[in-house]
Amino acid sequence: MRAGEYGNAELHRELESRAAFPQDAGTDDATSEAGAVEIIETHLSRLYFVGARVFKVKKAVDLGFVDFSTLEQRKFACDEEVRLNRRLAANTYLGVRPIVRGPGGAVRVGGAGAPVEYAVEMVRLPAAQMLDAKLARGEIDRACVDRIVARLAGFHEHAERGPEIDRFAAPEAVARNVLENLSGSRAAAQRFDEACGATAPSLSPLLARFLEGAFARFTADERPRFERRITEKRICEGHGDLHTGNLCILPDEVVAFDCIEFSRALRCLDVAADLAFLLMDLDRLGFRAFGRDLALRYSQRTHDPTLLALVPFYKAHLACVRGKVAALRGAGSAEAPVRAHSRSEAIGFFAQSASYALPPLLLATSGLPGSKKSFVARALAPRLDAVHLQSDFERKRLAGVAPTEPTAPEARAQVYFRTKRDRCKILF
């Protein structure tokens, strides 16, 4: 099998039958049709939703950064997936089931016989309680933010640490990781564009060069900061794939599932990087203010103020990772709707990555009195993740006058004179 080529397709077709799965999988109100098997496909796995259970089968693929090309490798990855995910989803991951062929040649999950494949068995979580679904319905409040922060902070506090883990977050390792991922993103995007006959690139050479320069400069300039993070014990064996679709907000528990099982290098990381994945996804969905609040609360709870300075860098890197994954998913599908959606996602993620690497922007509004300058600026600020400064208040601040205190006519000239004299200090 060529590297990157999808295998075990015949087996996957046989698993589309309900008869292949255990009868004790139970029932679930979310199942749209009695006895139906619902299937979700990713670039690495196929998930079979059967009643109250989910069975996840890894594809026989070798994509370079992950190799599932042999049965032994897939079995090991299944075992690791259960072990690692039980840290944050102990009641969800039930174990690894062998997939065997019966005497008549029919495939079934579980039972006696020589395994032809393996599946991770999970409890089916309610789709309506996933974080992305709750956000879409406007059901997230301050208490929910606190629950998420407490769950992630507690997980990171007790996660495995040590020199073998720290090495994955050393400055040279971080630089190598982000630049290798960018190179892989270029290759994946190019293959995807060629496969679907795109006339414009998903990741343009100009944008790729911009990201390469930004990543190289940041990792070089911030080397002392990366080293301090190791000294401060901010590196751990984390989750590695914390996005809104992998968090389920249950009444009595926050469940984080589907962590990175296939690469220790990708899940051994700075806690800032683990959190940044979730923050980047919140930005993508239009909940930037929610993410900012979550990051601040996490920083305060963990007494980690320097975390916030690294978040934009990790957001940029992880958005690029998501862009590469979208390109790989699109290239691996022959279905036009999947390719179109994947291409849109890839372009969006690569653009989002670049947005975090852009230099600071100063945007000033001007106009006649009463022309809604402050109204427009106030509305734009949260959308641009910007600080809203009002000239009236800034002038008074420089003159030592309270924002709500009226300026006497005789003092007004002095306020404006001082503002004019110090305007460069205000802006720069």
Tell what function each PLM region has.
Residues K373:
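Conserved lysine of the Walker
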Residues V376, L380:
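Hydrophobic positions on the alpha1 helix immediately C-terminal to the Walker A/P-loop
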Residues N8-H239, T244-V321:
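Conserved ATP-binding subdomain of kinase catalytic cores across diverse folds
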Residues L363-T365, S391:
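Hydrophobic anchor at the beta1->P-loop junction of P-loop NTPases
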Residues V401-F428:
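Conserved nucleotide-sensing/catalytic segment adjacent to the nucleotide-binding pocket
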Residues R292-A357:
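Helix-rich C-terminal or lid/interface subdomains of diverse kinases
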Residues L368-P369:
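The conserved Walker
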Residues F257-D258, A386-V401:
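Short beta-strand-centered segment that lines the nucleotide-binding/catalytic pocket of NTP-utilizing
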